[in-house]
């Protein structure tokens, strides 16, 4: 009997444990469902306004162990550069401002008869003495194409033509084709690449658009052109951008998945990755560089950063692969930290300051509020460093102290947020060392967004060559955008000047978007 009872007790204990595990899992799934609903139907921003302000309580931050904010005391005023400004409603742009980048043609009205032009007083024919613009309209010209034929001429000697040794010479030295054996030109190739990568139009839709213009160009042909333009020209320029990037002191990195159908030894469903590397706020011409890689391995991060200067500041998220990068000062992205805590807030508790997830968000918001203030006042990096030490360091210290006091169990969203924050402990204050460092990795996230937007339309790359070409073309296009260039003009400019592996970095720099001649030729934005 005792044995039977023991078995029953053990069985009941196991069932209770299984039931508790199921309840925990149910709670986690419910939390996931609430998060998905919040992402679909809730606010799209993680920033929460502070509604808890009244005459007796100027700020809620003392509740979190942070002293109320006082008026900033000047620190070495010679470093502070404050520009006065007045917030006002943005004036509506004029028609001339709206269309300042398009050419203007004029039609002179000639509706008066000869009789109408006679002076009613003396009968003399009146002469033009001035003009005025009656109205304006914008004309759309449908894109057009034409075939350009290079015609060579053969010259023969009229005297020797009937002899046994007729003499002739051929004038057939036409400019080299963009791609040997192909009929594409810099203008056609640049338009296709601009539509595909800047406007995210898939090749199959471009195929139809070209057919409407009278040209039958298959999507396969267009894809091959992209690959060959990359291997022949773009790659040499983007490699130069990467080499220049490695010389910078402030770097930012991010990555996002893509799908490549035909990778050696991998299934079509395998995840591949786009890696982004860009310059930070260093006062130099900004550089963006994209790289395709079959994996998210830290070896990719190591390869991308091979050759950087020791002591470089690297801003990235908490992905462990970046741990392989040595000799850098890692900066933590507080936007990621805030996002973790924001996603841990239970539905309907966004304004509940007693909720620990809300408190975590408020710590982050406090830091960002200081950064916004520095930007509004146009502080120089030297001043930002001093202000951060005074304003932001105490916030981070209080944040860490608060985190260490939290007691969590299970695998909840808040537990994950807290773990993510604590795991960044060694890097939380790195950005305080230099005023050029940023508080978040938002620049990288914004820079990688064009790839994610394009991915929704074209879904995948067919081959490794196609993926590599795509990333280099994205590099060219986003560099043009970053420097205020017309993206299609810049693509065409590069294809006309044809960078090669034989060019030195000095020669390649003449094709960079910050070059004066490039700015003058391609300098009108298309975005």
Kindly label every feature range from the protein language model.
Residues 1-182, 223, 253, 391, ...:
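Short, flexible loop/hinge motifs at secondary-structure junctions
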Residues 27, 116-117, 154-156, 161-527:
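Catalytic center-proximal scaffold of phosphoryl-transfer enzymes
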């Amino acid at each position: 009997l005792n044995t039977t009872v023991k078995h029953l007790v053990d069985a009941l204990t196991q069932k209770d444990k299984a039931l508790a595990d199921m309840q925990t899992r149910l709670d986690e799934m419910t939390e996931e469902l609430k998060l998905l609903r919040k992402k679909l139907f809730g606010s799209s921003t993680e920033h929460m306004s502070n509604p808890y302000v009244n005459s007796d309580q100027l700020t809620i931050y003392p509740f979190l162990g942070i002293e109320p904010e006082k008026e900033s005391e000047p620190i070495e005023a010679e470093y502070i550069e404050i520009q006065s400004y007045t917030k006002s409603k943005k004036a509506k742009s004029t028609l001339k401002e709206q269309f300042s980048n398009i050419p203007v043609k004029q039609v002179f009205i000639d509706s008066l008869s000869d009789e109408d032009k006679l002076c009613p007083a003396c009968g003399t024919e009146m002469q033009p003495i001035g003009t005025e613009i009656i109205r304006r309209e914008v004309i759309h010209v449908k894109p057009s194409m034409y075939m350009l034929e290079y015609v060579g001429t053969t010259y023969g000697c009229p005297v020797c033509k009937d002899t046994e040794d007729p003499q002739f010479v051929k004038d057939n030295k036409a400019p080299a084709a963009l791609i040997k054996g192909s009929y594409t030109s810099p203008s056609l190739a640049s338009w296709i690449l601009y539509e595909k990568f800047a406007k995210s139009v898939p090749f199959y839709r471009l195929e139809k658009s070209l057919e409407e213009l009278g040209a039958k160009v298959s999507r396969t042909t267009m894809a091959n052109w992209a690959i060959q333009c990359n291997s022949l020209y773009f790659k040499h320029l983007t490699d130069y951008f990467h080499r220049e990037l490695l010389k910078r002191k402030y770097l930012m990195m991010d990555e996002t998945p893509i799908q490549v159908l035909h990778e050696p030894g991998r299934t079509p469903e395998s995840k591949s990755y786009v890696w982004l590397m860009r310059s930070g706020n260093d006062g130099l011409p900004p550089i963006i560089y994209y790289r395709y890689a079959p994996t998210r391995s830290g070896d990719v991060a190591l390869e991308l950063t091979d050759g950087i200067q020791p002591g470089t500041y690297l801003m990235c998220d908490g992905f462990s692969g970046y741990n392989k990068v040595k000799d850098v000062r890692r900066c933590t992205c507080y936007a990621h930290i805030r996002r973790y805590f924001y996603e841990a807030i239970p539905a309907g508790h966004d304004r509940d300051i007693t909720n620990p997830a809300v408190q975590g968000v408020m710590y982050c918001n406090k830091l960002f509020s200081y950064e916004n203030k520095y930007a509004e006042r146009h502080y120089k990096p030297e001043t930002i460093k001093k202000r951060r030490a005074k304003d932001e360091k105490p916030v981070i210290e209080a944040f860490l102290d608060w985190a260490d006091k939290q007691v969590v169990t299970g695998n909840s969203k808040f537990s994950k947020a807290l773990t993510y924050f604590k795991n960044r402990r060694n890097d939380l204050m790195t950005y305080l060392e230099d005023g050029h460092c940023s508080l978040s990795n938002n620049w990288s996230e914004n820079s990688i967004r064009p790839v994610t937007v394009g991915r929704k339309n074209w879904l995948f790359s067919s081959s490794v060559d196609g993926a590599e070409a795509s990333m280099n073309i994205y590099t060219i296009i986003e560099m043009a955008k970053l420097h205020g260039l017309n993206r299609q003009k810049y693509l065409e400019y590069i294809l006309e000047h044809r960078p090669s592996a034989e060019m030195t970095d000095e020669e390649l720099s003449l094709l960079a978007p910050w070059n004066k001649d490039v700015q003058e030729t391609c300098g009108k934005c298309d975005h």
